[in-house]
Design a protein with these regions (language model features):
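Bacterial N-terminal signal peptides that target proteins for export
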Residues: 2-16
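Structured interaction patches on ligand/partner-binding surfaces of diverse proteins
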Residues: 92-129
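A short, solvent-exposed beta-strand micro-motif common in secreted/extracellular proteins
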Residues: 82-94
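Sec/Tat signal peptide C-region and signal peptidase I cleavage site
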Residues: 15, 26-31
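Short, surface-exposed binding/anchoring microloops in extracellular/periplasmic proteins
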Residues: 30-82
Length: 129
């Protein structure tokens, strides 16, 4: 093996290692977790989705919802991007016309139903009649 090929191989490995390390550092720096505390004080079961306002993302996603029985309090942990704005939409199961926050499919405007992903947990969000 010539001295030149060893030098190029060594440089290539260093570049590859640098790119891998930069990828790990970049991905981890923007990640955060927040827990939404949701309480159903309505006499009927509720369905809840959480919507990013900064990217096209819904929790839990894939056509699923978080389900809260009447009287139930649920902790909903999310992995999100640091600083991301997340709003909740909740509605009576089987009655999308009775809703809280942004409602089904993030379709309504709301006041005080959005939180910034900075870690920790929200105060208890009480969904009342």
């Amino acid at each position: 093996m010539s001295k030149t090929s060893i030098t190029f191989a060594s440089i290539g490995r260093r570049i590859a290692l640098g790119l891998v390390l930069a990828g790990f550092a970049g991905g981890a720096a923007g990640a955060a977790e927040v827990t939404f505390m949701m309480r159903n004080s309505h006499p009927n079961a509720l369905e809840v989705e959480l919507y990013s306002q900064d990217r096209n993302h819904v929790w839990p996603g894939n056509g699923e919802v978080y389900y809260l029985d009447d009287g139930e309090t649920k902790q909903i942990p999310l992995s999100c991007d640091e600083g991301e704005k997340i709003c909740y939409g909740a509605w009576v199961s089987g009655d999308k016309g009775t809703y809280w926050g942004t409602g089904p499919n993030n379709g309504e405007h709301c006041e005080d139903c959005c939180y910034t992903c900075t870690g920790g947990e929200t105060e208890t969000i009480d969904l009342v009649e």
